[in-house]
UniProtKB/Swiss-Prot annotation:
Keywords: Lectin
Cysteine-cysteine disulfides: none
InterPro entries in the record: C-type_lectin-like/link_sf, CTDL_fold
Protein name (record): Putative C-type lectin protein FPV003/FPV258
GO molecular function ontology, one term from the record: carbohydrate binding
SUPFAM superfamilies found in the cross-reference section: C-type lectin-like
Keyword Cell wall biogenesis/degradation assigned: no
Ranges of residues in domain C-type lectin: 21-122
C-alpha cells in the first residue's frame, strides 16, 4: 500500500513539473515558445501586430523578452525554426523612438517598428 501511495505521489510530482504547451507553442528549455517566421511576405507583421497576435493567440502569450531567450540553447532553437529570418521580440531596454527589437537567432538588432517580420512568442 505504501509503495502505491509513493508511486502515485511521484507521478503527480512528475506531472506538475512537466510543461504542457498549448496551440502553436512548443515546449523547449522549460518554456512554451512559438517561432512564427511567416514565409509569405503578406503574412509578416509589424511589431504591434506581432505583439497583438501573441496576446490574442493565448491570453498569457507575449513577444519573447530578450533576457529570457538570450542564451545559446534558445538562440539555436530560434535560428533553426526561424530559418535565419528576422523575428520580432521585446527588449528589456527601451530602444530609441520608432525602433523595435528583433533577432535572427544569431544576433539582436533594432529596426523600424513598422517593418514586417515573423515573431517569437512565449506563453
Amino acid at each position: 500500500m505504501k509503495s502505491l501511495i509513493l508511486i502515485a505521489m511521484l507521478l503527480m510530482l512528475d506531472c506538475a513539473n512537466s510543461l504542457n504547451c498549448r496551440g502553436p507553442y512548443t515546449s523547449y528549455n522549460n518554456k512554451c515558445i512559438w517561432v512564427n517566421r511567416l514565409d509569405k511576405m503578406h503574412h509578416k507583421k509589424t511589431y504591434s501586430e506581432a505583439s497583438t497576435t501573441c496576446l490574442i493567440t493565448f491570453p498569457m502569450g507575449t513577444l519573447a523578452r530578450r533576457s529570457l531567450i538570450d542564451n545559446e540553447k534558445d538562440m539555436k532553437f530560434i535560428s533553426k525554426f526561424g530559418m535565419g529570418q528576422s523575428l520580432w521580440i521585446r527588449d528589456d531596454k527601451k530602444p530609441e523612438v520608432g525602433k523595435c527589437a528583433y533577432t535572427d537567432g544569431k544576433t539582436f538588432g533594432f529596426s523600424p517598428c513598422n517593418a514586417t517580420y515573423g515573431f517569437v512568442c512565449i506563453d
